[in-house]
Amino acid sequence: MMELLSNNSVPQQMASSNAPSANNVAHSSTANGSGGGSVSSNASNSSERLLAGILESFPAWDLNVGLLPNVGQSSPPRADFFINNFLGGLDTHGDFSIGPIGSGARSNPKMSPESSNNSSISCGWCEVSASIRCLECNEFMCNDCLREHRNSPLSSNHSIVSLPTPIGASPTGGSSVNAQTPPSGNFICDIHNEMLRYVCDYCRKLVCQCCTLHEHKEHSYASIQSFMVGSKEKLEGAIESSQVGTRCIKSSIDKALAFIRLIERNCSELSDNIRKAFRQFIIAIEDRERFLLDFVEKLRQRRLAILHDQMAGLKSALAGLSETSDMLSKVADNACNMDQIEIAMKLTNGQRQMEQFAGIYKDLQPKQEVFAFAPPDYSLLQDIRNQGGVILVDDKNLPIVSSSNGIVPSVSSVNAVAAASVGVVGGVAGVVGGVGVSNGLDLAFGMNMPNNPLSVASSSVRRPLLRDNSFRIPSPIMQPRGGSACGMSSGMSSAALDWELNGLRSSPGLHFSAPRTTQAIPGCMDLVKVRNSNALSLSFATEGHEDGQVSRPWGLCVDKMGHVLVSDRRNNRVQVFNPDGSLKFKFGRKGVGNGEFDLPAGICVDVDNRIIVVDKDNHRVQIFTASGVFLLKFGSYGKEYGQFQYPWDVAVNSRRQIVVTDSRNHRIQQFDSEGRFIRQIVFDNHGQTKGIASPRGVCYTPTGNIIVSDFDNHCLYLIDPDINDILSVKGHEGSGFHEFNRPSGLCCDDEGRIIVADSKNQRILVFNQNLDFMWDIEVRPSINPLMPPTLDEKDRTCDVAIMPDGRIVFLIELSPDSKEGSNPYKRFVHVF
């Protein structure tokens, strides 16, 4: 193609330019002879360097990390590297030597200096055909003028390049038979308007000769011909690198989407955790406030009673003293008419009475008592303001689980790491203010949200609007006991509570005097675990009005001795049966007085073996001893706190908290053991279809949560009473294994299994702790031949309970269109 000086470095060439003209000519021919080998050697070295780095020239993709920088090991090129590398890509032709030239004004060439075609370019000094070009002067010269140009002190170190061989011409100057088409503008340098002849390995772009001497002077480059050696391997490597890069980028995008969902879920859990945690502080303060106010009220009443008693005694003494004074006055007035003995008797009696009245006056003397309020330690306010915090769990300790959209951390694992890192209750170690740092951790969250899809309501379901219009009675503060986050005993299987824990995440510290764990049968010494049995073991309670007979019963429960308690609704009484089905005793009658009922419904027994009965049409709840003696009642008709409109079912937990389904008020209410209102959860018609129009059955789970059956919307709700929030929703109308049709009574065993009376589907459903179907009991004789043939095909299940040995006992009710007394042999209580 072209020729540039020789294989020597620029300083050597500049030194040689000072030699005589003859020597210069000889040296020029010698240089040309040896230059070809040097050029070939340089081209070979450049190609080897380029090919050796083919694989290293593409980005290094890491599928787990992303795009990693490719750090090269080559050192910067030498100062004269661009000359040697430049010569490697040149073809030589013709001779030229460097000699002294003079300086003087010369005319411009006939073509523009930017043109790369020298077929008609003339020397700007002597009008001879130009063969070289001075880059600094931007002038074309012939070989003779170059010598004069070199001899000038001002231009002795200028950069000289030879002009390219004309397109279509042979290197020797002859015409080419197959003339090539001139390159288009796309192959011309945008800066110097020169043909692109080299590939800059550093910049990954094509450059011209001028670029190699200026903009890319310190870079490593090679000719296009050398670069094209191994082009197939380069293309394959580039394609492979692009494919790997595509997979890496897509994987990173999937990770980002997964992390976005994780952040939304995590922040929601953080908010719930913060509300639940600080709610305990609020509850503790409210409890203390109510305790002190209650103490002041009792103190006021006691002091007023004492003062009123003192006033009554003093008034009595005053009246007696007045009578004595009148008697003595009469004696004084009639002394002349009275015997001495009579006078002495009157006088001594008067003196004795006056001494008694004086003693009363002395004993009943009012005393002034002034109490003062000892204010709390206000320095605790700052400590309370600094409680809690949010820390970042260290990624090094963060367990990783796989996801369909990438690799994402498990939130439950994050909680375990956060809890282990923090190791404190109610706060964060080393946290000061709202955001703290503990052992290099910057922010924290600690709530469990497993990925069970059953743990939350469907996104298409609008959750009921909850009102927190409640207050709590004074009660001592007690930290949770047991090894779990819910304060459960360490022996209880945490896997048995997955459905609740999926929605619950974790439970706060308790604010009542008992742990949150609740037994299936209060006070039972053994673990009650429901067992799968299709064999009918016992049936009793025929229809009628005699002892041991029932009329449209609804409520059912079992005590720790295995006695079966039934709310005999139409007979307005409660009957207690022995485990063998024989009647033990009964109590109650129709009326509105204490111990009287008007259609009793739900029934349960607490840890003290007290019997709690919902007096439905009297709109109240009554509590009796284990022998049926009336203790107390609470509730009346209305919509206010503590009032009911047709309450239906009742349940009690280990803290003796009583929960009642208030069907017509579309809510549930919670009370303490004495019937004092604690809280309510109101459902404002925002359920799957028309809201909880009629909450029916209710029970406590082993962790103290509440499950409510929605009679009209055919579903179950899992509720955390401490935060007044619905955690999970399950079911819809249908006859499948995960569907309900008028669900009614329900209960739980000690491992969290849920037993539901699916009323209109005429069956009993048993679910595990995740609400996955386990088995069912059909009550229609046509489907279940083990059922007594005396049952009608329209009979429904209404309530269910568990015997201490794990057998299921359920209650049958007549369908609304059935006629009473149609079958005297029909039994309403069945044990499987």
Swiss-Prot record:
Keyword hit for Ribonucleoprotein: no
Keywords: Developmental protein, Differentiation, Metal-binding, Myogenesis, Phosphoprotein, Repeat, Zinc, Zinc-finger
Swiss-Prot/TrEMBL GO biological process terms: cell differentiation; instar larval development; muscle attachment; regulation of cell-cell adhesion mediated by integrin
Residue windows of the NHL repeats: 537-580, 584-627, 631-674, 680-722, 727-770
Positions annotated to bind Zn(2+) 2: C189, H192, C211, H216
Record's function text: Vital for larval development. Plays a role in tumor formation. A crucial component for the physical link between integrins and the cytoskeleton in the epidermal muscle attachment sites.
Name of the protein: Protein wech
Organism, scientific name: Drosophila melanogaster
